[in-house]
Amino acid sequence: MTLSRDDAAQVAKVLSEALPYIRRFVGKTLVIKYGGNAMESEELKAGFARDVVLMKAVGINPVVVHGGGPQIGDLLKRLSIESHFIDGMRVTDAATMDVVEMVLGGQVNKDIVNLINRHGGSAIGLTGKDAELIRAKKLTVTRQTPEMTKPEIIDIGHVGEVTGVNVGLLNMLVKGDFIPVIAPIGVGSNGESYNINADLVAGKVAEALKAEKLMLLTNIAGLMDKQGQVLTGLSTEQVNELIADGTIYGGMLPKIRCALEAVQGGVTSAHIIDGRVPNAVLLEIFTDSGVGTLISNRKRH
């Protein structure tokens, strides 16, 4: 099939716009947190796999960290195990942790690996327990009301926070032309398993690798101002101001704090991108306009 003149011109424009970005990012590492709608639509899933394979083909090193909250919730429901959340975190007792490991490590992770490989990549699936990739400790959660003289410690079970990343393993895989796909399960000092927020794992992996970019796929268009307009480029100082004045609040706060910590920890830029947009990852990396919000220590994309 021959392209029309208009279609050919559009293809040429896209390729020429992408070329400077490809040159800039060759040999660089990009950590992508994959989740939300992008994991549910078959079209978006295929597009994500193609994006990752193309990045690797042009010399960029993608590392994928994935979520799987809805899939965990579905299996818990089928097993008649009730889900409880505190401050957005799933209370994870021993039975729930078994389900988390089954779903994230055994189902979701392998589905993503298989999808990338079917589109021409060489993906390898890992959990944080493999070669102690993600070392973790129990997350301490506290709560205090005006009536309390001291904070109350709340036990949320096998929920963890990252204490270390096996950078040597990831570098070995990346140099071997593999695409690491990581399930956010950490391992404690005694071999115990921890359920960790995927955004936090992605941020810590990006920091440890000194990645060029941390990309967080979400179900929103990006960070918005109080008028509902997407803020396309922000410095870390501007983000802190938006938190202070209440523009950023609620469920977005943990994600934004994760992005801020990554940039302050050595990642060149963090991106909050709309995973509902087909090929969102490529559009954010390889076009002038992008499809989300970029956070960096600089003012511009």
Curated annotation (Swiss-Prot):
InterPro entries hit by this protein: AceGlu_kinase-like_sf, AcgluKinase_fam, ArgB, Asp/Glu/Uridylate_kinase, Glu/AcGlu_kinase, NAGK-C
Keyword Disulfide bond annotated: no
Single Gene Ontology MF annotation: acetylglutamate kinase activity
Site (Transition state stabilizer): 33, 255
Cellular location(s): Cytoplasm
Gene Ontology, cellular component aspect: cytoplasm
Reaction catalysed by this enzyme: N-acetyl-L-glutamate + ATP = N-acetyl-L-glutamyl 5-phosphate + ADP
Record EC number: 2.7.2.8
Residue positions binding substrate: 68-69, 90, 195
Keywords: Amino-acid biosynthesis, Arginine biosynthesis, ATP-binding, Cytoplasm, Kinase, Nucleotide-binding, Transferase
DNA-binding listed as a keyword: no
Pathway(s) where this gene product acts: Amino-acid biosynthesis; L-arginine biosynthesis; N(2)-acetyl-L-ornithine from L-glutamate: step 2/4
BP GO terms, sorted: arginine biosynthetic process via ornithine; L-arginine biosynthetic process
Pfam annotation, one family: AA_kinase
HAMAP family for the chain: ArgB
Subunit text: Homohexamer.
Function of the protein: Catalyzes the ATP-dependent phosphorylation of N-acetyl-L-glutamate.
Family under the similarity heading: Belongs to the acetylglutamate kinase family. ArgB subfamily.
Name recorded for this polypeptide: Acetylglutamate kinase
Species of origin: Pseudomonas aeruginosa (strain ATCC 15692 / DSM 22644 / CIP 104116 / JCM 14847 / LMG 12228 / 1C / PRS 101 / PAO1)
